[in-house]
Swiss-Prot record:
Localization in the cell: Secreted; Target cell membrane
Protein name: Cytotoxin homolog 3
Organism: Naja melanoleuca (Forest cobra)
Gene3D superfamilies according to UniProt: CD59
Function: Has low cytotoxic activity.
Tissue specificity annotation: Expressed by the venom gland.
Pfam families (UniProt xref): Toxin_cobra-type
Length: 61
């Protein structure tokens, strides 16, 4: 799977074996700014400050 790995949506990398999810972390405050993107084996947990969304197709984050 290929995932974006910077806050900018046009830079991506091929994920290592076992990392079959892409994630996007968005700051909840002040304005839903994209904070972090990358590969994961499990979806990171949403916290008080960051909302994570995961998906499993190329460049879906």
């Amino acid at each position: 799977i290929k995932c974006h790995n910077t806050p900018l949506p046009f830079i991506y990398k091929t994920c290592p074996e076992g990392n079959n999810l892409c994630f996007k972390g968005t700051l909840k405050f002040p304005k839903k700014i994209t904070y972090k993107r990358g590969c994961a084996d499990a979806c990171p947990k949403t916290s008080a400050l960051v909302k994570y969304v995961c998906c499993n197709t190329d460049k879906c984050n």
